[in-house]
Design a protein with these regions (language model features):
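Short, low-complexity patches enriched in S/T/P/G
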Residues: 334-345
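Conserved beta-strand-loop-beta-strand hairpin that lines the nucleotide-binding pocket
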Residues: 144-150, 198-335
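Ser/Thr/Pro/Gly-rich low-complexity linker/stalk segments immediately outside membranes or between
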Residues: 364-379
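A short, hydrophobic beta-strand element within the central beta-sheet of small alpha/beta folds
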Residues: 67, 87-101
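Conserved acidic segment of CheY-like receiver
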Residues: 18-30, 35-39, 47-48, 56, ...
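Alpha4 helix (beta4-alpha4-beta5 surface) of REC/receiver domains from two-component response regulators
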Residues: 75-80, 96-115
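Active-site beta3 strand of CheY-like receiver
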Residues: 62-73
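Bergerat-fold GHKL ATPase/HATPase_c domain
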Residues: 99-103, 121-188, 199-213, 253-255, ...
Length: 415
């Protein structure tokens, strides 16, 4: 039934309120209804098409802000979306916990988010993802919790600090309701992420690892100049651990490389030269959400979110993986102080010394005696024997001149 003119006008006014537009490829009517409501919450208008051939119609209003594809439908594949606004970032929707499919999606340069859509779908995850992609503010575990949830922060500068931080995380996880086996798996993920931030993330100005070549025993005695920041929070159902370094050496290619190992039945031993190692695989198979916030040459934040209810039911492993990249430029290095040639400095110093000695000599000369000629205004000596005293000042020296009339002469003396 066609809509009335009044309804159409209301829809046009509503479209003007929403600043962003998201193009979604899906054949699922239920998903269309759900995503339309969710995207309205973030100020975005959602346009749906069922086939990539309909892109021409969808592009009449210009390119969208984001593209979303529902890979649960057999006819929709990663290859089919290659030509759909290839310059726009892509969110992939999958139907199950398929690590190989997750890695394949993230291997696309334009794709940074893979979300599972089933009966356990979490709307908040989709809202947070779209908001971060649209506005670019990617760091912070507080984005994954409602207002009012307490966030606990710690800083790690040594091996002993790491042990204390893990004790705090385990104690807080127990208070939050995590049972023994679940708590142990969460602690293992936390330790792996902290080790990556402490030992694998630090690099020099040329990007070469600082500590990766050192033996483990020697690493336990190092105090780190750039501290690792660890945060944790819980709302009773979700427990999150965030680990942040201050180097920003982790890139998306490395993340995808190690996440792809999650699809292997038998994991290879960790190669210490490989960087983040199998700790990321451990997080992939334990946490329910895994978020990588990357700021090249600035910092890396890895957030692992655990759904306590799902984990207690035996449903471990990621349901969504996100790799966000901060496009800020790294701060420029501090400029080197200008180098001044030594020869002019020496010559200038000698000149100053000579001037000082000259001034001292003049003062001493003044103090030795009055000058031979002094001009001053004196009263008229109109008779023989009349005397007058005239005060004068030479530099900082006060003198008095005595004038005496002797016949036709005037005798001047100082005292």
């Amino acid at each position: 039934m066609p809509s009335s003119p009044r309804t159409g006008a209301a829809e046009r006014r509503g479209d003007q309120i929403l600043r962003h537009r998201i193009l979604c490829l899906t054949t699922d009517p239920a998903m269309r209804r759900a995503l339309k409501r969710l995207m309205t919450a973030v100020g975005a208008l959602t346009e749906f098409i069922a086939d990539p051939s309909q892109v021409a119609t969808a592009s009449e209003d210009g390119p969208p802000s984001l593209v979303c594809i529902d890979l649960r439908a057999p006819e929709l594949t990663l290859a089919s979306v290659e030509a759909v606004f290839p310059e726009k970032r892509l969110i992939c929707i999958v139907g199950g916990q398929d690590f190989a499919q997750i890695s394949a999606c993230l291997s696309l340069p334009r794709c940074g988010s893979v979300i599972t859509y089933d009966d356990k779908f979490e709307p908040e995850d989709f809202i947070i993802t779209v908001t971060k992609l649209l506005h670019g503010q990617i760091f912070g575990v507080q984005k994954y919790f409602p207002w009012g949830v307490t966030l606990y922060n710690m800083e790690i500068a040594s091996y002993d600090d790491k042990i204390k931080a893990l004790d705090v995380l385990c104690a807080y996880a127990e208070l939050a309701g995590a049972r023994g086996p679940v708590r142990d798996r969460m602690a293992l993920v936390a330790e792996e992420l902290i080790i990556n931030a402490m030992y694998h993330a630090p690099v020099d100005d040329e990007g070469k690892p600082l500590f990766r070549h050192l033996p483990r025993k020697e690493l336990t005695h190092i105090d780190f100049e750039r501290r690792v920041k660890v945060s944790c929070a819980s709302n009773g159902q979700h427990f999150a651990i965030a680990v942040r370094d201050q180097y920003g050496s982790l890139d998306k290619d490395t993340v995808v490389k190690f996440l792809s190992k999650g699809a292997l039945a038998i994991l290879e031993p960790e190669n210490r030269d490989s960087g983040a190692g199998l700790g990321l695989v451990s997080a992939l198979k334990t946490a329910n959400q895994l978020i990588f916030n990357l700021a090249p040459a600035i910092g890396t934040e890895v957030i692992a979110v655990f759904d306590l209810d799902l984990m207690h039911q035996g449903h471990a492993g990621v349901r969504s993986v996100h790799v966000f990249t901060d496009r800020r430029r790294p701060p420029p290095p501090d400029p080197e102080p200008p180098r001044i040639p030594m020869a002019p400095m020496v010559a200038g110093a000698l000149a100053v010394i000579l001037i000082i000695f000259g001034i001292v000599g003049v003062v001493r000369k003044i103090q030795e005696g009055p000058p031979t000629m002094v001009s001053a205004e004196v009263p008229l000596l109109d008779r023989d024997g009349k005397t007058e005293e005239v005060p004068i000042k030479v530099g900082n020296t006060d003198l008095k001149l005595r004038l005496e009339r002797k016949g036709s002469r005037v005798v001047i003396s100082s005292h």
